[in-house]
Amino acid sequence: MRTTVRICGEENDMKLLEMNHVRKEFDTLKVLKDISLSVEEGEVVSIIGPSGSGKSTLLRCATMLETMDGGELLYIGEKAAWEVNGQTVYAPKAEKKRLASCFGLVFQNFNLFPHYTVMKNITEALIVVDKVPKKEACERAEKLLEQLGLADKKDAYPCQLSGGQQQRVSIARALARQPKILFFDEPTSALDPELTVEVLKVIKELARQHMTMIIVTHEMQFAKEVSDRIIFMEEGIIKEQGTPEELFGTDNERVREFIGHLSGYKAEEN
């Protein structure tokens, strides 16, 4: 478990994200069953569990890419979605857009525009959506590329980059909008082991800087080292959660079995 200056439960803790009694169905399949969770400012939460447990759907509901079928979603105490007479109601478009600026999302398959350079991939949303002046947008992008070891790639196209470099560009793009919370949906699942280490080092550094993050991952050792809290999901519910020490030392036979089956990434000691 990482060292953190934040202690959950203190009066000045800020809940950046709250999800209360969230439900989601696809046809007759209940994917999320009454899920409730909250994330404090500066907290790193990893979500683990078998495929089909609802982890990615939970992230997509949290980021409003999927419409919830029930429950409540709040960012910094402000409602983005709530339930009225059994139906989910979302905030008006302008309010929803403002609340969406609170978070950034890094996908497992990079989702870069292939016909844009690295620089344009990072700055396009800043300029077009956020109305940031082009000069400021470029300055933000250049600073992030420098921090992520990609300063010499700003004029390159995605096809000219390795998978690890593409994912670092995706992280830079998310960070450029200065979100309060970052979501990662299995950020290394499309990478080979060497490139996986490259990307996980970047996320570990963000954790050291107290960036609030929710990370869906199968990298057990990484989750143990980087997280304040680990959530185990299965069959659309949160079956167990706690500190890394609590999860990795649990008496819950199913959780022990799952963790034991995934040796995953062995984090480098720094």
Spans of model-derived segments:
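The feature captures the beta-strand-to-loop junction immediately N-terminal to the Walker
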Residues: 48-50
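Short coil-to-helix segment of the ABC ATPase nucleotide-binding domain corresponding to the Q-loop/switch region
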Residues: 116-124
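Conserved ABC ATPase signature
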Residues: 157-161, 165
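A short, proline-enriched helix->beta-strand linker immediately N-terminal to the Walker B motif
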Residues: 176-180
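Catalytic Walker B motif of ABC-type/P-loop ATPase nucleotide-binding domains
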Residues: 182-185
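Conserved ABC ATPase "signature" C-loop
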Residues: 235-236
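ABC ATPase "signature
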Residues: 241-242
